[in-house]
Amino acid sequence: MPNQPLENAHTFTLEVSNKMGVHARPAAMIVRIASHFSGEIWVTKKDGERVNAKSIMGIMMLAAARGSELTFECTPEDAPELEKQMSDLFASKFQDE
């Protein structure tokens, strides 16, 4: 359920730093990574909107511009590898620049 926090969830926050923000291609990259994990993964924008990280439409609906902070919430077993892969993706500025 989208409004229910995950039990024993691990969270981490990343900042969008590319000029164009999270448009279609970065959204697809986020979904591609999230889809490799079996557990639930949610993303929350600072304003409180929470979406499934495996949904490209959900990620795009966040309209995350440069400087937006996105908080990922996942199951503990997925946490170390998911955080590493997402951190690397965000650090690469989604290969936009």
Which residues does each PLM region occupy?
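A short alpha-helix capping/helix-coil boundary motif
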Residues: 8-11, 39
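Compact, glycine-rich, soluble single-domain proteins
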Residues: 15-65
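Generic structural detector for well-ordered beta-strands
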Residues: 13-15, 73
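C-terminal structural segments of small proteins and small subunits
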Residues: 63-97
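Broad gene-expression machinery/nucleic-acid interaction feature
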Residues: 11, 56, 69
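Short, glycine- and charge-enriched coil/turn segments that flank and shape catalytic ligand pockets
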Residues: 8-9, 48, 77
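SAM-dependent methyltransferases
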Residues: 1-9
